[in-house]
Amino acid sequence: MAAGLPPLVVSPDLVKSRPERPAGQAPAQSPDAPEVQAQPSAPARSLPTPESPPPAVALPPVGTPAEPAAGAAPAESGPIAAGATEIRAQQISGTRAVELVAEGNAELRRDGILLSADRLTYSELTDEARAEGNVLVAQGTDRVEGPRANLKIAEQVGEFEAPQYRFSRRSDPAPGEPVREISGSGHADVMHFEGENQYRLENATWSTCQADDPDWYIKARDLELDYDREVGVVRGGSVIFQDVPIFWWPWAEFPLVAQRQSGFLSPTVGVSNKAGVDISVPYYWNLAPNYDATFAPRFMGRRGVQLGGEFRYLTPGYRGESRVEWLPRDAVTGEERALGSVQHQQQITPNLYGSLDLNAVSDDQYFEDLSSRLSVASQVNLLREGRLSYVASDWWSASALVQSYQTLSGEDPYRRLPQLLLNANRQDMAAGTVFGFRGEYVQFEHTDSRKPEGSRFTLYPQLSLPFERPGYYVTPKIGVHHTQYALDRDLSGESDSITRSLPIFTLDSGLNFERDTTLFAREYLQTLEPRIYYVRTPYRNQDDIPVFDTARFDFGFAQIFSENLYAGGDRIADANQVTAAVTSRLIDPGTGAERMRATIGQRYYFDEQRVALPGEPRRGERRADMLAAFSGRVTTSSSIDSAWQYNPREQLTERFNFAVRYQPEFAKALNLGYRYSREVLEDLDLSGQWPLGGGWYGVARVTRSLKENRITETIAGLEYDGGCWVVRSAVHRFATNPDDVTEALFVQLELNGLASVGSSPVNLLKRSVAGYGKINEPVSDRVFGAY
């Protein structure tokens, strides 16, 4: 026996008529193995899995005289020792010193590797096995089949003729994502084993679509699979879809287990009336595990060639990303156009945090001309802000910021250069009182010399005494709101120093009643929760105070339970008013989930309004509009959400919103929405996604302005699920104003587990169609350039 070779156990089969291996039997998994989420695909090719071998007969090493006694039963071997080799067959001949020949369902096992064939020849001296006829090499979930193979077992070096193969690995998911088993299969002329987890294939195919005749696959002159680095390399390759080549690569690298990998991302192709034919071919650099970059050249048929790039980074203490776009010359406008964006967040010390958010474009029409997304094209202001925040404890914090905007449409807001804030809320005060405080210093500046500038200093200490008992609560609160203005550019001719001090008193109280009830043959816990909220703020003339950042709150349930009508610090409304409201809820007693909620409320005024913004009419009536809202899940598959604002003085509806959704299962959703605001808008919105049969799905949305008698937004799309691939198309038309309409076409082919081609409408559909489901989720992560 050669020195240094592992021990060998040879076991002739005790039963001549050994059963065949069952076809299609899945490999056994450890009971401790994590559950995996399989990717949708066509039926997988059946691969044989050998059953457990019969009891082994242990033979002593060559030269050992011990022999079993005549007629004695052969000894059964226990588990195979690490590094030991076991051979089983119906017939074994030869000697260990030269070579052993095993015939008839022959198997060789060592350290989790199985080599089986009709005939096996094994040389212990060279550790080389030659296999012929129905050859199978298996290790874990990996399988390779073919007619002939030569393999050095320990080194895992050799060749396999005309193999069919399937390799599977579990992904290493990000927190919150499921574990997925990512499999690839194909066939080749020759497979070269080049060490553990290293394979090189000639004239090979590769597909993550598991089927005997996959709809798509990679075809390569040379294919390398390196499962140590989890990287595949294609040379002279193409992607075949439905027997038609759609890609060709002289060389490409791709991840095997869905990890990030440098290389070209899938190209995006689209069409819009603003940009024309729109093609982008991004290149992705995986620079390190915690930072990467993308270079994205973009060709627009009507505009020209745009260069773009993005850089991202992430560490335990900070994270951020930067993005640039540059169009040297717009063929339509003849001008240079550009975009820049920087976002950064950092934990400087355990209590000190910093952030930076800078955004800029070359001109006001940049997004409207160069974006096909309504949410982007309708942007009004671009934020430019730097912020430091200090959290000293669980009851107080401070922050400092500088802030300005690039205004694309409308009036420029004031810049805050700087703004300092101090907030506190301490619960453990004497006699159960709660201390609150808000302090602010802000310097306002404006680019328009016709507008006033100056600083505002605010102190607002508050003291409250909550009484909370089962079934009710009462919380009185008193505070003094003090404001000091120092005006640098006072255009009114009044004093450049203004002081305002106002006491503010509120009383918040509520009751909570509960009872068991039955609705639609189901038991619920029903609540009745009346609430009364009183505010008293004396009048102070504030007409000489400029308006830097103040606007009236939108009227709604949040506003009627607030102490001030205005957002911002330039107006403190006089108030002697009470708000009364009642809420009733249906709660599932088993889960605690809220099934339905109904609320109605109204504010009552004891005095007329005297404080107002410039040009704002003052309220004279004693009753505010009535508010009502209802939301809930009517059935397990349908829900309603509605809100109503009613003017009792004129007996008119001021605003009304209504939305109903029917969603019986994934990728089935129908939505109806109606929005009304008197003299402002009246919109009807319909959207949905629904299977049409045969793997086809329809998705659409239409929004019509009943007030203007025109359609403001339309989406129409079709999707087809081919099992291991999906094709999507969508047309999007929207109008930011009646004279400016944008139209865009999205077409995408997604090969599950490989790549996508075209421009994806998925984000658009998720934003626009409530309940939209991506029909091929969950899928294996894209591997060609996915990140």
Curated annotation (Swiss-Prot):
GO BP field: Gram-negative-bacterium-type cell outer membrane assembly; lipopolysaccharide transport
Compositional bias of kind Low complexity: 59-78
InterPro entries: LipoPS_assembly_LptD, LptD, LptD_2, LptD_C
Domain of life: Bacteria
GO cellular component, one term: transporter complex
Coiled coil: none
Region (Disordered): 1-78
Family matches, as HAMAP family: LPS_assembly_LptD
Subunit structure: Component of the lipopolysaccharide transport and assembly complex. Interacts with LptE and LptA.
Function according to Swiss-Prot or TrEMBL: Together with LptE, is involved in the assembly of lipopolysaccharide (LPS) at the surface of the outer membrane.
Protein name (Swiss-Prot/TrEMBL): LPS-assembly protein LptD
Species name: Aromatoleum aromaticum (strain DSM 19018 / LMG 30748 / EbN1) (Azoarcus sp. (strain EbN1))
Gene: lptD
